[in-house]
Amino acid sequence: MNVLSSICYGGDYNPEQWPEEIWYEDAKLMQKAGVNLVSLGIFSWSKIEPSDGVFDFEWLDKVIDILYDHGVYINLGTATATTPAWFVKKYPDSLPIDESGVILSFGSRQHYCPNHPQLITHIKRLVRAIAERYKNHPALKMWHVNNEYACHVSKCFCENCAVAFRKWLKERYKTIDELNERWGTNFWGQRYNHWDEINPPRKAPTFINPSQELDYYRFMNDSILKLFLTEKEILREVTPDIPVSTNFMGSFKPLNYFQWAQHVDIVTWDSYPDPREGLPIQHAMMNDLMRSLRKGQPFILMEQVTSHVNWRDINVPKPPGVMRLWSYATIARGADGIMFFQWRQSRAGAEKFHGAMVPHFLNENNRIYREVTQLGQELKKLDCLVGSRIKAEVAIIFDWENWWAVELSSKPHNKLRYIPIVEAYYRELYKRNIAVDFVRPSDDLTKYKVVIAPMLYMVKEGEDENLRQFVANGGTLIVSFFSGIVDENDRVHLGGYPGPLRDILGIFVEEFVPYPETKVNKIYSNDGEYDCTTWADIIRLEGAEPLATFKGDWYAGLPAVTRNCYGKGEGIYVGTYPDSNYLGRLLEQVFAKHHINPILEVAENVEVQQRETDEWKYLIIINHNDYEVTLSLPEDKIYQNMIDGKCFRGGELRIQGVDVAVLREHDEAGKV
């Protein structure tokens, strides 16, 4: 679903922070900058409803009309991101409570319990009032529900949540005996006889039952999703043709975005990579993840910053050109919109030093606004990209419930973190410009040739069969250490590790050897010696062949990496955390077998992605280096640079440092 027929460009707009004369100035500046969409009213509950049941829309009417008169459309917020002071005063028990029993007070934002009944009642009234007010306004193009759900309060442990949790558990398990079985409550004498004996996993003397903790992750995710769906139901009823979304936050642990994405019309998300980290690999990974949530549907980058944020210890600015560069890198991975937080930099409040499209002091030479305007004018030329897709032959399994489970306490290695392991594999694809999707273990895998499963600790019923069929039909499955260990309740799969994946991989893991942070071992393969860290599996072969063996320690000579033929395909098991050199070589060998090639052969730190429509192919090339690079395009093609409009024959192409090229591909006859 496209919000506009062009690339969306703009940012969060908070006119309630400014006098009316600034509104007109803002609209003119937006017009000059090429802004066509702003997110409006996100934190305006206290302004729209200054007292219980009393609504004031006059100011918002005027703002929307001014913007529309200047060609700016509205992504209208439902204003539910922060409850007003009058609501908190009237319903003090609506404030969230943490695991230690501490009440989180008013004075910040997101200070509400998602299961408070009066919160839900008041949200319904507010959202319906806003929807009815603006349902026929031609400026309305999209709904922005709440804001960054769970960003600050992902779990509440109050009595309202306790009651709701018991109800959720009863619906899930039906009987208390089934819950006891699934949670393993005979351990440490935790057995329950009645539902009302169960509480949220509050602060306890020592380790909490991990099955209970895992279910509380699920419960809170469902509780917050229910809030979103409460609003969406009203918006769909009143404005059935207006797309509804809420802004995600990439690899945000508390919310299962694969589940959430089924309920939004378009994925939108917020991204704030640190300029100090250089090459924005995790930003690229999150763009690919966000695109994958709705099976490749283009998304909108709802928030980024023009220069610097305010919430890190040290908030360095993006150097000149980097905001533009990273924006194009986002478009390259499937974005149909580039938005910012925020339009005008705040004068007061907690984010007054957070960068914006219009800084505190604006003159004709201001670098930030100049770059904002340049990008806005360029994006007007890229309407052709709207709706185009990315085709990938490689997928990485990413599973939120697996993430929750693998990072619960009481593991062999309690410093293991899921995202760095996923990123280690992704990094090798990124460096080689191999397009990649993210999938769940239960998703349809038939269009992929290679599927990578980093630390798939949890394998739920049926997921192993999906992976088994993928391999049997000719795919390559690459599985990392500490995979196939538990079921959906964090109960160990009996019969040996890696549980239901043993037959696919042709191995048996006898023991785990977690490494201290300073320990480095070596692995041998037929092409050299490589470092490995973090973990070693003691592997016994059950039909697989070793691709690499450990050099040191008491398990020297035992397999570290294995390959097993299964059906028409193969299962590769990586029983350690090898260095980038080894992972890269391993993946290159697999890709060569499947004839998976980079889109272009390019210099280091040059990012290339291809977006496609039924008619055209578009190459988006980003030079992250600060120096010029030269690359070769096929000489039998004609290319059009969509930014400057020039056409040229393939061959040598030069791209300046910190610069981009967006090329439409033609054949000799001028067609795809």
Curated annotation (Swiss-Prot):
Temperature-dependent activity: Optimum temperature for the activity is 70 degrees Celsius using ONPG as substrate. Stable up to 70 degrees Celsius. Retains 80% of the activity at 75 degrees Celsius. Kinetics of thermal inactivation and half-life times at 60, 65 and 70 degrees Celsius are 120, 50 and 9 hours, respectively.
Residues involved in Zn(2+) binding: 113, 156, 158, 161
Gene Ontology CC entries for this record: beta-galactosidase complex
Binding site for substrate: 109, 147, 311, 351-354
Functional summary from the UniProt entry: Hydrolyzes 6-bromo-2-naphthyl-beta-D-galactopyranoside and o-nitrophenyl-beta-D-galactopyranoside (ONPG). Possesses a high level of transgalactosylation activity. Hydrolyzes lactose in milk.
Source species: Geobacillus kaustophilus
EC number: 3.2.1.23
Name of the protein described by the UniProt record: Beta-galactosidase bgaB
Name of the gene this protein is made from: bgaB
